Amino acid sequence: MEFLGTTQTATYCGPKKPCGGSVLPSVASGPTVQECYQPYYLPGYRYLNAWRPSLFYKVANAQTCLDEGATCRSALRPPTILPAVRSALFCRYSPQDWDQSNRLQLCGAEASRLWAGRMTGDSMRLMQDKDQLTRQMQEGTCRNLGQRLSDIGFWKSELNYELERLLNENHSLDAIKRRLECAAEELRCPLQVALECLYQREKRIGIDLVHDNVEKNLIREVDMIKCCQEQMRKLAQRIDIQMRENRDAQHALERDLEDKNSAEFIDEKCLNLRNTSDCISFFHGVEKIDGTISVPETWAKFSNDNIRHSQNMRANSIRLREEAQNLFDVLADQLWRQFTNTNLAFNARIAEETDVKNKLQTQLAKTLQEIFQTENTIMLLERSIMAKECPLKVAQTRLECRTRRPNVELCRDSPQFKLVNEVFTIDDTLQTLKLRLRETRDTLQLLVMTKCRLEHELAIKANTLCIDKEKCMAMRKTFPSTPCMGICP
């Protein structure tokens, strides 16, 4: 049997060769290195495979015995007649060969180790340099994205501000138009607004559906508006044309805002991406695609032009409203008192509703805090119960194990008393905690019911406040009964 790592030239594997020139076996050629690696490219890393080894190594087995040596061994076998007459037929290496071989092995190992150490150090420095470069590039990109988000936020705020002012102007202009048309049709629009307030207030819920001072003043105002007549048709036509132009400017602002919202969402998503994000992937050749259609200068100019156009439209609208306001002065004296009285009643009612709503919200906040504390108490009680179960299991297991003691060893000793007492004590503790847990849960249920009632009352008050403040008062801001009704603040 041939052992792994042995050669056929060892002294115990064959007789001595007849040649006397050399006592050493022929030296086999060194390990042959074959380049057999075909690189495998990951997606996006066709030219970034420096982290993989460039070679696989295959070591060829050395031929350690020549054909002639085999012939010599087969020809010269030692005689088996008398062991005493055997000659020294086995060749051996010299101590110098042995020392030289060891030195060569040690030197080779040391050289390989030093080379590997240098390669490791260089690799670590290379990785650190590339990591620092990658981190700096990523931080720079994040800063640029943050600056871009700041620019988008600035223009969004400008567009929102202008859009809000344009919308307010459109509402005001629409109110002027309605007032002019209604003046031409015997002030039917003021009558409709007053009736709409009454209609909206009919949508109040529950106890808030009261016949209050606001409703009385609205009914009185409806009766007074029916007496007013005026015609302003020509100015209404000009206002209608201006409103169409305002809507065009509004749509341009809204489209610009929508695009900026989308861009802000995308850039914010890009800014929040990290190396550990789940949604990152390879996109081959994306850096070669340039689908941009603007530069920062033209991008800013586009929004600035939209804002300037909207400002021009608002200026035209303001001039038209001022012209209409001069016509409304004739009607102002007749409806001023009733309009003021109704508004004062609305403000007083809104103040009352706001005060009640704030009190309910305060009580709801306290109730929610108490619910939170009660839930925490329930959680702590449940944890405490769970924490007591393991000691109870331990004590019961100990008792059960001690019941298996043999014969007279089954003694009612001090540990037995202690274990029994421990089981009773822990069980009593568990029962007490479970009772307290049930009581706490009942309290939590009561608090939840209270919260539901408060939320229902808050919904009623919020609905009433929305009707009076957001709907009725918003409509009455464009109500044509005072000199200032043509211009919205």
Swiss-Prot record:
Pfam families on file: Tektin
Post-translational modification: Ubiquitinated, leading to its degradation. Deubiquitinated by USP16, promoting its stability.
UniProt GO BP: cilium assembly; cilium movement involved in cell motility; flagellated sperm motility
Signal peptide (UniProt feature, chain positions): none
A GO CC term attached to the entry: axonemal A tubule inner sheath
Main location: cytoplasm
Compartments in which it is found: Cytoplasm, Cytoskeleton, Flagellum axoneme
Coiled-coil blocks: 158-188, 225-264, 346-383, 427-447
Keywords: Cell projection, Cilium, Coiled coil, Cytoplasm, Cytoskeleton, Flagellum, Ubl conjugation
Keyword Cell membrane applies: no
Family: Belongs to the tektin family.
Function: Sperm-specific microtubule inner protein (MIP) part of the dynein-decorated doublet microtubules (DMTs) in flagellar axoneme. Forms an extensive interaction network in different conformations that reinforces the helix bundle composed by other tektin proteins (TEKT1 to TEKT4) and MIPs to anchor the tektin bundle onto the tubulin wall of A-tubule of the sperm flagellum.
Record note on quaternary structure: Microtubule inner protein component of sperm flagellar doublet microtubules. Interacts with TEKT3.
Name recorded for this polypeptide: Tektin-5
Taxonomic source organism: Bos taurus
This protein's encoding gene: TEKT5
